[in-house]
Amino acid sequence: MKDDFAEEEEVQSFGYKRFGIQEGTQCTKCKNNWALKFSIVLLYILCALLTITVAILGYKVVEKMDNVTDGMETSHQTYDNKLTAVESDLKKLGDQAGKKALSTNSELSTFRSDILDLRQQLQEITEKTSKNKDTLEKLQANGDSLVDRQSQLKETLQNNSFLITTVNKTLQAYNGYVTNLQQDTSVLQGNLQSQMYSQSVVIMNLNNLNLTQVQQRNLISNLQQSVDDTSLAIQRIKNDFQNLQQVFLQAKKDTDWLKEKVQSLQTLAANNSALAKANNDTLEDMNSQLSSFTGQMDNITTISQANEQSLKDLQDLHKDTENRTAVKFSQLEERFQVFETDIVNIISNISYTAHHLRTLTSNLNDVRTTCTDTLTRHTDDLTSLNNTLVNIRLDSISLRMQQDMMRSKLDTEVANLSVVMEEMKLVDSKHGQLIKNFTILQGPPGPRGPKGDRGSQGPPGPTGNKGQKGEKGEPGPPGPAGERGTIGPVGPPGERGSKGSKGSQGPKGSRGSPGKPGPQGPSGDPGPPGPPGKDGLPGPQGPPGFQGLQGTVGEPGVPGPRGLPGLPGVPGMPGPKGPPGPPGPSGAMEPLALQNEPTPASEVNGCPPHWKNFTDKCYYFSLEKEIFEDAKLFCEDKSSHLVFINSREEQQWIKKHTVGRESHWIGLTDSEQESEWKWLDGSPVDYKNWKAGQPDNWGSGHGPGEDCAGLIYAGQWNDFQCDEINNFICEKEREAVPSSIL
């Protein structure tokens, strides 16, 4: 280091001599030195600015390009190394320029022009990077919007798939319900058949019971006759027994008398011994007969008691059987009523399920249309997404091309810098040759020179003690890229990359042709039962149920309060002519009062019997049911027509008289032209009271449409098929009530 410093002082102390001219210490060289120093400072500043700008540009490019600009980072690092090498070369040139001649000013000016060109190129590069930054931001925004749309599309597709699965599950559930209902109907039909069979069996049993009752009655009557006969026989036996007792007493008296006679007539004992023995034998026979009679009497009494007990048992059994049959009949009637209600409920449920299935089919058709629309929209969105992805790929390719262009430009610029450096080295060598020809004079001592090069490595010293572990140093700059090695084996699949930047939205593509319908997927598992739905609209009027069995006659009710006195009745017909009376006294004949023949009085309100009056019209509410044409003919036979409802007041009045009853035909139809409803006289409909969603002409495509109108349970209008059976309402003008003639 000291030798280098001494050499620099010697160089600065000597002057130079050329063409016989020798300059002193105070000459133009000082001015040139100051200019050189100023130019060197400017070069340092420019190099520092250049390095700063290049570092900033490289940092921004690396920050914005992410994974796409990995090559840019390596190139930036190589360029930094080259620029540091350029700086070191420039420093060396600056050190050597202090020793060189004045001719370097022109070369410095050329170098300045080159640096200005580099600045312009760097400005262009910055502008391009800013533009690329804007395009990258746009691409990121477009990519984010595409990701959002894709997420929305996925959500909508998931929702649609969930809806389709739920609809399929509901359809499967309804199919299960329908199959269960069919099974229930088949079971009910079997139960009805079994009940009919059991009913026939019960009827047979009842007939058998009636026969057995008749037979029991006959047996009871026969038993009563036999009991009467036995009672008569017992009375006869009692009378015979009494006679026998009297005979026995008489015999005892005779024996006593005989004993007295024997005592008195011992002499006649021998003669009468045979008679006595005979009498004893007869008495013994009589005693045995009496004992047999008493046994027979006991047997007869026991038999009569057993017969009486059996009669009582038979009467109890008869009462029990009557009670049981009555209970069984009541149970059978209750069962029949329950079966009738069940059948009515089943029919209503079947009609409701049919209506519900119709609504389900309509809803499914709506869902199909919405699904097709959404699928077409999704296909359009997917095509647009594909187009945007293609555009993003093209943009990325263009960006890569621009990056390659920038790399090539930077390579050319670095090559130009290396060429400039080589030219500077050549100029320095020329300047050195020129300086050798100068005569060097001792000049004033110059400023302290820069730090010298590192000396040679000395011999290794003795190994010292192991020190503490130092702090981790900063990572060094990456080295230059080495030569490309041989292709290694295929590595394992890498992790999924980070989410790319969002591209710009591309133009909407043309709508593609609809694809072929895919195969029907397997039916899924039935889902959990959903929450109970809201109460639906009242279903259509069901078919009339079967006529129920006649109930038992109830007990008479409490007599109500006495009503108001009625209107005077119609005067009766004149009675038969009586016999002529006795002749009256002669005198002046008085004139008889003229008297009108009695006529049947009409209704007070001007309407026939069973007709009701409202304003100036009469209405007939039928109890029988007919189809539309038969109802119209019935009203025409009554010189009237089916009712025409032309005001709200008339509608409310008719509603009061039909609340709680079944449907009624009115004179409204669209049989002439579909959906053009007219009254039967051809007049248009001014007042309307249709139910919500009516008239719907249900049945088009499935059978005859609904072309006739009627009133339903709520007083609103509904369209029916004309061959259905309903009640009806007739209407005609009220007759004028004539004043009564006294």
Swiss-Prot record:
Membrane topology note: Single-pass type II membrane protein
Cysteine-cysteine disulfides: C607-C618, C635-C730, C708-C722
UniProt GO MF annotations: carbohydrate binding; low-density lipoprotein particle binding; metal ion binding; pattern recognition receptor activity; scavenger receptor activity
Gene induction: Up-regulated in activated microglia and by fibrillar amyloid-beta peptide in activated astrocytes.
Keywords per UniProt: Calcium, Coiled coil, Collagen, Disulfide bond, Glycoprotein, Lectin, Membrane, Metal-binding, Receptor, Repeat, Signal-anchor, Transmembrane, Transmembrane helix
Protein name per its UniProtKB record: Collectin-12
Membrane topology (Cytoplasmic): 1-37
Transmembrane segments annotated in the record for this chain: 38-58
Sites where a glycan is attached: N67, N159, N168, N271
Region Disordered, residue ranges: 439-608
Compartments reported by the entry: Membrane
Biological processes, Gene Ontology terms: cellular response to exogenous dsRNA; defense response to bacterium; immune response; phagocytosis, recognition; plasma membrane raft organization; toll-like receptor 3 signaling pathway
Residue span(s) of domain C-type lectin: 614-731
Encoding gene, per UniProt annotation: Colec12
